[in-house]
Amino acid sequence: MPSSAVRRFTDSDDYAAAIRATRAEITVTGRGHFTAKLTRIDLHRLRMQRFSDNLPRVGHSAVMNGRAIISFRTHPGPSLLWGGVETKPASITRHNEHLSEFIRVRLLGAMSLPVEDMVSIGAAIAGCGLTPPKDALTLTPSPSAMAKPQRLHAAAGQLAEDAPEIIIHPEAAWSLEQALIEAMVRCLAEGELGEDRSALRYHVLIMHRFRRAVEENPDQPLYIPEPCKSIGCRTGRCGHAARSSWG
């Protein structure tokens, strides 16, 4: 049944815990009073989320939910990183199905479909394969193509806030869902693939290993050289990997 919810937060841990179908952690890196808003919209098969928070931060998200996920920026601004992939205001990102990524994006929209639906719809609408990629991919559609899902996503978020009764109406939800799916698939089909990010993906792998090394020693203080040594990586390289992965 279609539904929606809009929640506001002043605690980053509560915000991370509320993100759907993920184990998320957020570390705020800037000074100030943290505030965030999370909008969740479920139509029939399509699920949507809108994320907005006010302070610089680094996040880690691990998702295993059998859905094909795409995301894009909801507001203009400088290029940022999600899982080693540069996210630009006019780009759209296809995520791998079992993603585990470091995130430095604060104003973000996401949509997902069951994997089998994404595959069949991609073939039917655009004649292309949309099975989730092995590694996250960033695509740049034409500005006019990208503007449509951004506009529809923003409108859905506004309805969730101001007129949630429209979203729960089955026919209205179906019409909105079809428009969003078509706009999303058109962007994915025509988008220009971003440059090879193999070096960034390697840096993200180093950060995952570093994170595991820290988690294996939760009750003792660790100095940076110790986990670097345990994962077989020089301290300088770990630092470079952190900067390229987290920004």
Locations of regions flagged by a protein language model:
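N-terminal low-complexity or simple alpha-helical regulatory segments
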Residues: 1-66, 70-72
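Extended, Lys/Arg-enriched charged tracts that mediate electrostatic binding to polyanionic substrates
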Residues: 75-76
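Alpha-helical bundle regulatory/interaction domains
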Residues: 1-33, 79-225, 229-235, 240, ...
